[in-house]
Regions:
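Short amphipathic alpha-helical interface segments
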Residues: 5-63
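General helical secondary-structure elements
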Residues: 11-13, 66, 76, 86
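Alpha-helix N-cap and coil->helix boundary residues
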Residues: 31-35, 70, 86
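A short, conserved structural fragment
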Residues: 79-89
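Short, cationic-aromatic polyanion-contact patches
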Residues: 89-96
């Protein structure tokens, strides 16, 4: 059994940003990078935007490290915009 079988996605940077924004909107308190990555992966699987993998079966519930880094970059950009605060891999919305 392969343990390191993460799933890649083929979303554009713009669509990825939209999904991360949706995830942030749904959060009431603090949230994590892992939560944002799981949200993006869920919608990629629902929308058919996962990259083809050997075996073609979903044998993982984890987003690929490269795509999770893309999610992290989006979150960091939103931090720089002043809309969320970061504490390591935890984030919190800043009140309007």
């Amino acid at each position: 059994m392969t343990q390191n079988n993460a799933i890649g996605i083929d979303y554009s940077d713009q669509r990825l940003r939209v999904l991360v924004e949706e995830y942030i909107t749904q959060q009431r308190g603090t949230f994590s990078l892992q939560g944002a990555c799981a949200y993006v992966l869920y919608w990629a699987m629902e929308d058919g935007h996962t990259l083809p993998a050997a075996g073609a079966l979903y044998q993982s519930d984890k987003l690929s490290p490269a795509d999770c880094q893309r999610v992290s970059a989006v979150l960091q950009k939103i931090v720089r915009e002043g809309r969320i605060a970061a504490d390591g891999e935890r984030f919190q919305k800043i009140a309007d």
